[in-house]
Amino acid sequence: MKVKYLEVDNDVNVFVVGDIHACYTLLKEKLKEVGFNYNRDLLIAVGDLVDRGKENEKCVGLLNEHWFTSIKGNHEDFCYKGMMDDHIKFYHRMPNNGGEWFYELPDDLMEAVGRRLNQLPIMLEVKYKGKKFGFVHADLPVQDWELAKEMFRSSQLIA
């Protein structure tokens, strides 16, 4: 799925977070500070859940939470593509990228995590309180949201 669509009830508080980079404990502390309600609220992550920090598997586990959704960032892409391309794997394992943890996983778990991260959408469109909000990890190739969605849906753009 390249584009994911969500409609969020008006009584839900929506929070958005950037690059978590495996800092699960810090994320949970910040959610507590802002009064995040796990039974009612929604947290949207704009990619880069993993790498660089120490709590990678916990951050991947966020994808199983009903209150959490994410799009794919370049670090999720590194995990998946690094399983098949030695050049990407080499780059991903460099200390500044922080991907070593991924290749230390047992093979079956590494494949499962890589596949799960690759399933994340590239674009997220949220309808909330009568408005439409669009999320991507980085930049779009065009400045028109609808055109960008169509390009991704029709596979004119590879991510």
For each predicted feature, which ranges?
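Acidic, histidine-bearing metal-coordination/catalytic regions of metal-dependent phosphoesterases
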Residues: 1-14
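Short, flexible hinge/linker loops that cap or flank conserved catalytic cores
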Residues: 7-9, 37, 127
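Active-site neighborhood of divalent metal-dependent phosphoester bond hydrolases
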Residues: 56-126, 130-135, 141-142, 147-159
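Core catalytic region of metal-dependent phosphoesterases/phosphodiesterases
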Residues: 11-13, 17, 22-94
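Short, flexible, glycine/charge-rich loop motifs used to bind or transfer phosphoryl groups or to couple energy/partner
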Residues: 4-6, 33-34, 124
